[in-house]
Structures are given as structure tokens and as C-alpha cells.
């Protein structure tokens, strides 16, 4: 997980899941295990599983639920048509034998699943086409990078999956290991640049986070820094 992303909430229904939950918790300092009241002693107790998942989801909090995937899907289904935050959500078998990413492909759920899979020594059940084919999700850059336009990015990846080649302009080490269909003469381009501009057609524009400014929380200089970035043409 990136440094900026919250640690997951680990939600269990009974005592049988507690050992696995504690193993996952050890991977994420600060993570809490939420347990059903009267069934298991955990860090926090809840009385309604569905309400708890929905509250965490609406708060944009990553969720690791140790139960059947169907229970998680039915609990969150009323929220899935709403636009807004979609945090990573995955289902984990109580015995740690299966790790299933469900939601949040653009929020790092596959990365979370791989991390948990390493802890439990199991391969996560990743189904994201782009990640399986290219070895990375170009729409979910690692810490230190950000997409300029997510919606354009979705169309871009659809073209890649359709078989179009791509060229990479700029430097990003995480792209070097990707299994992208590269062609220096390709019409599609991944452009890594700090320059603030609108993406061109057939381009995936990625900005590296390369400016550091130390300010107090209420420092009026924050607005001045933003203006300086705009004046310098930096994203």
C-alpha cells in the first residue's frame, strides 16, 4: 500500500477468523480488527455486519472482510451505483486460503491483495485484465505519481487491451518492468511529466510528485505555493 493510503479495517464474524485476522493485522501497524459483539473479542465490536461495512465504505476506508465474498457484495450492493469514493474491498477466507479482491481496482485493491497473499503464502485471485496482461495497473500508479485524467485513462487502457501498441515518454521506474506492448512509433503514448497541461488525444498523462513544500497547517503561504506552481506550469 502507498504511504498515503489508510491501513485496512479487518472485519470478522466469529472466533474462527481471529487468528488469520491477527496475521493480517501484523502486516499493517495501526489496523484494527472489528468483531461481531457476543461472538468474538476484537479491537472493536459491532452489532450489524452490513451497517459496519457500509459505514467503512462510505468513509473511504479499505476493508478486509473475513467471510464469503457474496456476503460482502450483498452488504455493499446498495452503495455501488453511487458516484464517489470506492475504497479497496476484498474478501478473505477465514482460514487464509483465499484472497479475493472485489472493489477498488483503481484504489489499490490488487496491491493490498498481493500484500496479504504474501503474509498468508497464497496467490490472490486477481481478475483485472490490464494488470494480468501488463503486470501493473497503469491507472493506479504507485506512491509518487498521479494520473492527470482518470476517465481518459480508462479509454486509453481499453485501447491497450484492444491490442494497440504504446510508447513511453519520460522516466518512471515502475513502468520499466511492465509488460507493455511497446513500439517507439506507436500512436498511443504514456507521458510522464510534471508539466501541468491537458492530456492530448491518445495519451495517458502521469505527473510525478516532485515538489516538496513544508508548511504549517494554517499557513497562509499555502495559497502562495499553489500560485507559484501554476505560474511555473507544474501539476
Where are the regions a protein language model picked out?
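Extreme N-terminal starter segment of soluble prokaryotic enzymes
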Residues: 4-10
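A short beta-strand-loop structural module common to alpha/beta enzyme folds
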Residues: 30-44
